[in-house]
């Protein structure tokens, strides 16, 4: 028996999640898998009533009692800063150490692609985004807020452990799934410290995978190449913020966020959050 925790989210998220669960039921029946789903009302309505996105003990229960988590879209105009969405999504990503953000880029129908004369074969690659570090860890602060001397600091945190495990996972995925190349993207020509670490770790890891072609692209060059010639890519790996931006570009080339899938994974523990 596989147990799935379902968090339908807000607005259209609830409708999409309900439809997705019908697909899950059919898939489970087709492949002979016993699935039990439990729904959790973590979203804007509950947050407005309680002031809490993830209640006490929820993280531990989701980690220990379920095989996977389905999460619908979060967002409500009544909560302008998306505080509940950040608490739920980032709480799960960081709390469950879901360091792999897996974003397959696959064009299902040529009519959905805004690029001229692209076929379904042209868009078929995978982006791996580091999911627990970088500029999204929330380290920073504001000094002298509201004055002419206001200063805002936002730290970009990169650890050798975090960088190595996502780069290594990208290479392992490429090897297992028959992908021929891995591209690492950063901005080390400007971000001389954090992304120098990315460069050095990439060079160290790539020599262990001589059967896989690998190269480096600065992120601005990567975005141009994705638009110009997406067929050249098999696997892309990058940091948290750049991955967030690049995968939205890739989603639009597929036809929009509505047809772009996303998984947040920890291959070491087996935890998985699917959006």
At which residue positions do the language-model features occur?
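Short coil/turn connectors at secondary-structure junctions
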Residues: 1-3, 33, 64-66, 97-98, ...
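Glycine-rich phosphate/diphosphate-binding loop of Rossmann-like nucleotide-binding domains
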Residues: 5-22, 26-28, 147-220, 232
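Buried hydrophobic positions in well-ordered alpha/beta secondary-structure cores of metabolic enzymes
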Residues: 10-13, 67, 128, 170, ...
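N-terminal beta-loop-helix "entrance" segment that forms/cooperates
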Residues: 30-57, 224-226
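Glycine-rich phosphate/nucleotide-binding loop
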Residues: 46, 225-275
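N-terminal glycine-rich phosphate/adenylate-binding segment common to multiple enzyme folds
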Residues: 47-153, 241-243
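Short, small-residue-enriched loops and turns at beta-alpha junctions
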Residues: 77-78, 189-193, 224-225
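Short acidic loop-to-helix transition motifs that present clustered carboxylates
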Residues: 110, 217-224
């Amino acid at each position: 028996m596989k147990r799935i925790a379902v968090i339908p989210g807000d607005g259209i998220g609830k409708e999409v999640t309900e439809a997705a669960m019908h697909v899950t039921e059919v898939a489970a029946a087709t492949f002979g898998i016993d699935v039990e789903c439990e729904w959790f009302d973590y979203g804007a309505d509950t947050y407005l009533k309680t002031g809490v996105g993830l209640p006490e003990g929820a993280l531990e229960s989701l980690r220990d009692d379920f095989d996977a988590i389905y999460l619908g879209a979060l967002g409500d105009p009544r909560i302008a800063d998306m505080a509940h969405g950040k608490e739920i999504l980032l709480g799960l990503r960081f709390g469950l150490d879901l360091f792999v953000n897996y974003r397959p880029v696959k064009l299902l129908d040529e009519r959905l692609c805004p690029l001229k004369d692209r076929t379904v074969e042209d868009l078929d690659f995978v982006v791996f985004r580091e999911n627990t570090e970088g500029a999204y860890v929330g380290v920073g602060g504001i000094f002298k807020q509201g004055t002419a001397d206001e200063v805002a600091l936002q730290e970009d945190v990169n650890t050798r452990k975090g960088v190595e495990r996502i780069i290594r996972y990208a290479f392992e995925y490429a090897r297992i799934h028959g992908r021929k190349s891995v591209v690492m993207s950063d901005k080390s020509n400007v971000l001389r410290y954090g992304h120098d670490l990315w460069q050095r770790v990439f060079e160290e890891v790539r020599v262990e995978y001589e059967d896989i072609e690998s190269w480096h692209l600065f992120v601005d060059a990567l975005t141009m190449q994705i638009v110009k010639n997406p067929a050249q890519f098999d696997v892309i790996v990058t940091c948290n913020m750049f991955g967030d931006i690049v995968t939205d570009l890739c989603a639009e080339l597929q036809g929009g966020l509505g047809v772009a899938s996303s998984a947040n994974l920890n291959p070491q523990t087996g935890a998985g959050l699917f959006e």
